[in-house]
């Protein structure tokens, strides 16, 4: 059952504020192409106000209200937010499905992870105080040294539309746990649940200015946030092209950044596997979240001895995927997020065909859906490594298949990419899986599966997929600075210079 879209303003300094220029952006339901609401559009002027609010929150009461408060104080707020997310889970999931086209079952799963992420970082916030003043072993007895971990300050968090609330919370939860104050700028294509997070923060009494939520276009809100002198760090998830612009802006002030960018991840299937199990993982690894996954294993490498039979199974499994309005029960593939993305993906498929690839299955709009940005699950064969479809991130339900003859060839093909976010191998040979895991040029490796993600484990890439790690203890470290404190403990003078006495 549908749910009305709330009408919200920007969330700044603990209250709703109309954008200074009073601009708004329509919300389009990607399943129907209908306008179902709107969101506020922040501009440079609003960014200034939000940054000032975050800086005040950081230093209020000499930092004792937030940045220097005991970790248990921050943990209390994070747990309260988690409880409210659980309370509102059904409505949040429905809003997410309407806003970005994610199947409702997936959106519900995401909300469970959102609450779990806040709870996990509440525990880490609580444990942070006990880790302060960690001693450092020194070679000289006349000195003692210890380490302080302190919040970086005001952080700008720029997040994508494929996991609108979850990937925002991957940044919000650890940054607040660390004692930072934050300005969240979600994608203009899917911001609704991030504004609902702001409402939850208001409900639980989060101190004003600790979290500010600015919706709007990247050029009008994201860019001024990245370059703002009052922001101490930028954490970004999005495309390589936009990420490089964010880095350039941050570099002018030597501002630290962490980047989770695009991917073109490989999945290698050997000839010793259960073909049906492997086929399901291959499709899940590419078609989950409507194919809009930065870590999607969209380059499938199949051992030549099983290729024909395996590809046949892929097609059979693909035909069994329910493509529908994401609110329908049992939907497993919804629409892509926008008309622009829809047209971009179809252009990728068209170019692949013109370059000589075979569109074995899918490649167009499903016949039973006249409206909405729907694309059939698409399987492409006869691909060469020089083709655009093999080398560039599509960000849609498009799986490319190549064969290999040997383990060495599979590794070479897998690593032949500018990207290095995820990689997967399916084989019953444990030693082979270990060898390939070490050989993969990627930040995340899956064995006999694809795409599972846990709050406790690090997430991030290498090469053009970015740097820095989110989630786990590594996610908290993203928002902490390390300070060395060294004490001279001897009563004797230092004695380097000759005393005038």
From Swiss-Prot:
Q: Which GO terms describe its cellular component?
A: chloroplast; cytosol; leucoplast; mitochondrion; plant-type cell wall
For the protein in the UniProt heading, the enzyme class is oxidoreductase
What EC number(s) has UniProt assigned to this enzyme? 1.2.1.-, 1.2.1.47, 1.2.1.19, 1.2.1.8
At which positions is NAD(+) bound? Answer: 238-245, 294, 393
An example Pfam family from this entry, by short name, is: Aldedh
Q: Keywords of this protein's UniProt record, alphabetized? A: Chloroplast, Cytoplasm, Metal-binding, NAD, Oxidoreductase, Plastid, Sodium
Gene Ontology BP terms: cellular detoxification of aldehyde; glycine betaine biosynthetic process from choline; response to salt stress; response to water deprivation
Per the record, the pathway is:
Amine and polyamine biosynthesis; betaine biosynthesis via choline pathway; betaine from betaine aldehyde: step 1/1
* Site-annotated residues for Transition state stabilizer: 162
SUPFAM superfamilies xrefs: ALDH-like
Function of this protein? Dehydrogenase that catalyzes the oxidation of several aminoaldehydes. Metabolizes and detoxifies aldehyde products of polyamine degradation to non-toxic amino acids. Catalyzes the oxidation of 4-aminobutanal and 3-aminopropanal to 4-aminobutanoate and beta-alanine, respectively. Production of 4-aminobutinoate by ALDH10A8 may confer tolerance to salt stress. Catalyzes the oxidation of 4-(trimethylamino)butanal and 4-guanidinobutanal to 4-trimethylammoniobutanoate and 4-guanidinobutanoate, respectively. Involved in glycine betaine biosynthesis.
Q: Which family does it belong to?
A: Belongs to the aldehyde dehydrogenase family.
Q: What protein am I looking at?
A: Aminoaldehyde dehydrogenase ALDH10A8, chloroplastic
Taxonomy of the source species: Eukaryota, Viridiplantae, Streptophyta, Embryophyta, Tracheophyta
Q: Which gene encodes it?
A: ALDH10A8
